[in-house]
Amino acid sequence: IVPPKPSLSPVFVRNYTMASIAGVSVQDKLVYLYRGDKKLGEHRGDIGFTHKGLSGPGILDFSRNILSGDQLRINFIDDKADEFRSALITASEKEGKTAIQTYLKKYELPRSLLQLILKSIPIEPETRLAEITKIQRNQLVAAFCEYPFVVEKVGGFNMAMATAGGVSLAEVNSKTMESKLVPGLYFAGEV
């Protein structure tokens, strides 16, 4: 038996700063899972912001792998860090008078989310691309390519839409659903 645990659960975030945009969601974003400094995996999907944390298919599907204290990092723009940094440098040279908020519209993020991320750096939305310092550019890259959320906890059984664990599938014949350990014992449903 694999110990049962909640699955398809929302994630509660420590020191959550996005409660003001509860109800806002982003589509098809990449989420990275870190435990300490080690990247354990990544998952792509839609993400919803709640009053206390993260939800939506991109989080729910990944929740079985997440533990308290883990860090989720969300890539809001789908560019790799080096690509985004290069794009910002090029834009500052060619479109230097453009405000950072205007430039970032091409990534089609909800305005409220965009403003919260800029505020977290902090950088004023009206700051022109040519005025952005190297330090601010690095902060922009970190914030938009791997925005960090420290997991306080994963929703428990009362919030989970499914359960992970139970009978080990390694001990079940997948064609007949008969136990490999106890002949004549068959499983049905969520095992």
Give each language-model segment a name.
Residues K5-S7, G155-G156:
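A short, aromatic/hydrophobic, helix- or strand-capping loop or linear motif
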Residues I1-P3, S9-E131:
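An anion/pyrophosphate-binding glycine-rich loop and adjacent beta-alpha core
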Residues L116-V191:
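A glycine-rich dinucleotide-binding beta-alpha-beta segment and adjacent secondary-structure elements
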